[in-house]
């Protein structure tokens, strides 16, 4: 009896193996299978944004100037959302709205849907890139899990919220001042700052900043001296194998400061991961609620008492009046197609007027 020893070999010219070998080859910039999604989508999203902010007006969608060509600067230029009348149309270049006319497509706001969708898939591609690389070098996938938080915020704000409203028109435009205007809109129409999910998001982001500052300062404070350089960057060898800071010293320091301290690095770093990621996830969940017009906290008893008693006022009732003012002024400006006209007596007036 003859026994053949060896490994079963597939056909040499297997297309998948050829692609896999080329995509995952060790090179300066890793491509990978995720790169097939990431690089084209990121290229188109950034290219669309630069094109829109440089050349394309928002006159036909918002009645605004929004490009460098019209005199805007980096803070005021934007790729603006399509008109409200276009509802949730994908605004494909070859669709019934633009009918293949690139100029008309830009005028209708087609670049916004182009940037939003390619941007979302580009971010997802970047997360998959982290999964793929982590698997290749046998790391756990916590980087990718952490990056899911900003993806959740992007998708909820730019896609899910306008899908719950009457159209893409109510999403943020892609620009600095445009995002600020959207924040004011969220406050006036949804009382967003009093929403518990927003509160959790703020706690997560600011808490993460505090943790990051404390952690960096503590590590710097407890570094061992192993060189004669004048400063941190010259005194330490970045390629040394051993740790160069003292967890024990750091633990004792914070135990004396607060009475409690992290006892091991895994729990410390997991907490630094957990705080911002959970905060962003909660914030994204809150925006999904706003898409369905769920309300924030309402303290109706205070509103009723403030309406009946001119001497009773709280910071809450003052903010409610401010929100009414935002709605009254913003609705007419933001939605000129609705021909909203508010009588002078219903517009809020400051004490100086």
Curated annotation (Swiss-Prot):
This is Photosystem II D2 protein. CDD domains: Photosystem-II_D2. It comes from Amborella trichopoda. InterPro entries: D1/D2 (IPR055266), Photo_II_D1/D2_sf (IPR036854), Photo_RC_L/M (IPR000484), Photo_RC_L/M_CS (IPR055265), PSII_PsbD/D2 (IPR005868). The D1/D2 heterodimer binds P680, chlorophylls that are the primary electron donor of PSII, and subsequent electron acceptors. It shares a non-heme iron and each subunit binds pheophytin, quinone, additional chlorophylls, carotenoids and lipids. There is also a Cl(-1) ion associated with D1 and D2, which is required for oxygen evolution. The PSII complex binds additional chlorophylls, carotenoids and specific lipids. It is found in: Plastid, Chloroplast thylakoid membrane. 2 of the reaction center chlorophylls (ChlD1 and ChlD2) are entirely coordinated by water. Fe cation binds at residues 215, 269. One of its GO terms (molecular function) is chlorophyll binding. The lineage of its organism: Eukaryota, Viridiplantae, Streptophyta, Embryophyta, Tracheophyta.
């Amino acid at each position: 009896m003859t026994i053949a020893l060896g490994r079963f070999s597939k056909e040499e010219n297997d297309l998948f193996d050829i692609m896999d070998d080329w995509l995952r080859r060790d090179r300066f910039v890793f491509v990978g299978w995720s790169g097939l999604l990431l690089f084209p989508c990121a290229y188109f999203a950034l290219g669309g944004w630069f094109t829109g902010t440089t050349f394309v007006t928002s006159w036909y969608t918002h009645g605004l100037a929004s490009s460098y060509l019209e005199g805007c600067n980096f803070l005021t230029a934007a790729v603006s959302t399509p008109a409200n009348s276009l509802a949730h149309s994908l605004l494909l270049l070859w669709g019934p709205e633009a009918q293949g006319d690139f100029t008309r497509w830009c005028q209708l706001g087609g670049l916004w849907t182009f940037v939003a969708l390619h941007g979302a898939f580009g971010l997802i591609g970047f997360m998959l890139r982290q999964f793929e690389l982590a698997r290749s070098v046998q790391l756990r996938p916590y980087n990718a899990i952490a990056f899911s938080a900003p993806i959740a915020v992007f998708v909820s704000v730019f896609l899910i919220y306008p899908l719950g409203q009457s159209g893409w028109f109510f999403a943020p435009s892609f620009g600095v001042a445009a995002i600020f205007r959207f924040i004011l809109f969220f406050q006036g129409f949804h009382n967003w700052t009093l929403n518990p999910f927003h509160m959790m998001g703020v706690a997560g982001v600011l808490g993460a900043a505090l943790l990051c500052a404390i952690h960096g300062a503590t590590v710097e404070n407890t570094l061992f001296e192993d060189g004669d350089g004048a400063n941190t960057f010259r005194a330490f060898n970045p390629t040394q194998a051993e740790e160069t800071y003292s967890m024990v010293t750091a633990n004792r320091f914070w135990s004396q400061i607060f009475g409690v301290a992290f006892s091991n690095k895994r729990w410390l770093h997991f907490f630094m991961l957990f705080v911002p990621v959970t905060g962003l996830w909660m914030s994204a969940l809150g925006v999904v609620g706003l898409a369905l017009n769920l309300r924030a906290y309402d303290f109706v008893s205070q509103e009723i008492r403030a309406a009946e008693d001119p001497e009773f006022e709280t910071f809450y009732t003052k903010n409610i009046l401010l929100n009414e003012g935002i709605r009254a002024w913003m609705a007419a400006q933001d939605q000129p197609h609705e021909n909203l006209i508010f009588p002078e007596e219903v517009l809020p007036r400051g004490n100086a007027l």
